[in-house]
């Protein structure tokens, strides 16, 4: 396959608690079009436990994936014989789910003699703005989700430099833990955002972790502990206490995030010049307060903020299909012994928080 062809790729996503499949077209000029994008969330299955249970997630993927793939193909109006490639998220993620998705993709590719592309889930997030907005390289990615918080220089397909990461909790993880601590329902992120809208952020003097440091790393464990200490002091909590705690927590996250992104953008400019855009991806980007803060950060850095539509910020099959198509256009495919991975760094040389070194993402 070459970039001069129109490519049709099926993408499969099963790394956490969304079972998803999509068909995406990549045209010869590099533009893309989503033909179908089917996502089945497992929130109802995991809500009684207050978080994702890996075994339940894997079993749900087994039960759901065949039907979701069939629906994606039907909605796209195409057949397996017409596919240019089959892409699956091969990690990082919950290993049981990753195995389900990758094995399914291998079976389809083998039966129909179609190229297989084993996609890094993080790379799929990184390349989504090229599908939605035709964003040109290089750009600065802020990936914030329940499992990941990273600032990444996106220099090309498979060419990434991690500028900053969290040394403890991911932002989405911290939101979920605060929600659980305060007795709010799962999933916690939207609940904290909703409560914060009715709270007084100035009531508590919560710390702003890592503020002013020259690196671009994040830390949220100390902030989380400060919230826990205040909640324990106020027990039993009144509804307004919960709102104020959420507001104070979210305000501290916003201040820390803005400072850390500012540092990341400075590192980007020092190494690679001005970014074409600041791109936000991951489920945390759906938080409206965070979006407002990101707009301010981008304006201060004199760059453009790009945020994919909410349905493409959270885990989905279209981003996997698109990353597969981008790699396929460069002739990058995988063999049937491609392994599922629970851990898979986007920048393979970034072994310590804040270390950055240019690398090609290998498969």
UniProtKB/Swiss-Prot annotation:
The keyword Disulfide bond does not apply. One of its GO terms (molecular function) is iron ion binding. InterPro entries: ATPase_NBD (IPR043129), Gcp-like_dom (IPR000905), KAE1/TsaD (IPR017861), Peptidase_M22_CS (IPR017860), TsaD (IPR022450). Its EC number is 2.3.1.234. Fe cation binds at residues 121, 125, 315. Disulfide bonds: none annotated. One of its GO terms (biological process) is tRNA threonylcarbamoyladenosine modification. Keywords: Acyltransferase, Cytoplasm, Iron, Metal-binding, Transferase, tRNA processing. Its cofactor is Fe(2+). It is found in: Cytoplasm. It catalyses: L-threonylcarbamoyladenylate + adenosine(37) in tRNA = N(6)-L-threonylcarbamoyladenosine(37) in tRNA + AMP + H(+). Substrate binds at residues 143-147, 176, 189, 287. Binds 1 Fe(2+) ion per subunit. Its main location: cytoplasm. GO terms for cellular component: cytoplasm. Belongs to the KAE1 / TsaD family. Required for the formation of a threonylcarbamoyl group on adenosine at position 37 (t(6)A37) in tRNAs that read codons beginning with adenine. Is involved in the transfer of the threonylcarbamoyl moiety of threonylcarbamoyl-AMP (TC-AMP) to the N6 group of A37, together with TsaE and TsaB. TsaD likely plays a direct catalytic role in this reaction. HAMAP family: TsaD. This is tRNA N6-adenosine threonylcarbamoyltransferase. It comes from Rhodopseudomonas palustris (strain BisB5).
């Amino acid at each position: 396959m070459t970039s001069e062809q129109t490519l049709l790729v099926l993408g499969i996503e099963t790394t956490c608690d969304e079972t998803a499949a999509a068909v995406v077209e990549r045209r010869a000029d590099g533009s893309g079009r989503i033909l179908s994008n089917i996502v089945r969330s497992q929130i109802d299955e995991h809500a009684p436990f207050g978080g994702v249970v890996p075994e339940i997630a894997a079993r749900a993927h087994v039960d759901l994936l065949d039907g979701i793939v069939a629906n994606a193909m039907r909605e796209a109006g195409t057949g397996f014989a017409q596919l240019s490639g089959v892409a699956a998220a091969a990690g990082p993620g919950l290993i049981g789910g990753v195995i389900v998705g990758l094995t399914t993709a291998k079976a389809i590719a083998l039966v129909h003699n179609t190229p297989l592309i084993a996609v890094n889930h993080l790379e799929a997030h990184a390349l989504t703005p090229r599908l939605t907005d035709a964003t040109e390289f290089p750009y600065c990615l802020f990936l914030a989700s329940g499992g990941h918080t990273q600032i990444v220089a996106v220099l090309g397909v498979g060419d990434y430099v991690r500028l900053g990461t969290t040394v403890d909790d991911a932002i989405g993880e911290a939101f979920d833990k605060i929600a659980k601590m305060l007795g709010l329902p799962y999933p916690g992120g939207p609940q904290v955002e909703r409560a914060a809208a009715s709270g007084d952020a100035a009531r508590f003097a919560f710390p702003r972790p890592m503020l002013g440091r020259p690196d671009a790393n994040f830390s949220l464990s100390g902030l989380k502990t400060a919230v826990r200490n205040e909640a324990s002091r106020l027990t039993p909590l009144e509804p307004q206490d919960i709102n104020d705690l959420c507001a104070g927590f979210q305000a501290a996250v916003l201040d820390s995030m803005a400072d850390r992104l500012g540092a990341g953008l400075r590192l980007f400019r020092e190494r690679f010049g001005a970014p074409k855009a600041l791109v936000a991806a991951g489920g945390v980007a759906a938080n409206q307060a965070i979006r407002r803060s990101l707009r301010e950060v981008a304006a201060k850095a004199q760059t453009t903020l790009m945020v994919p539509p909410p349905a493409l910020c959270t885990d989905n099959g279209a981003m996997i299909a698109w990353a597969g198509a981008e790699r396929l256009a460069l002739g990058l495919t995988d063999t049937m012994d491609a392994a599922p991975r629970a851990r898979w760094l986007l920048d393979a040389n970034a072994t310590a928080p804040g270390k950055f070194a240019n690398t090609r993402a290998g498969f």
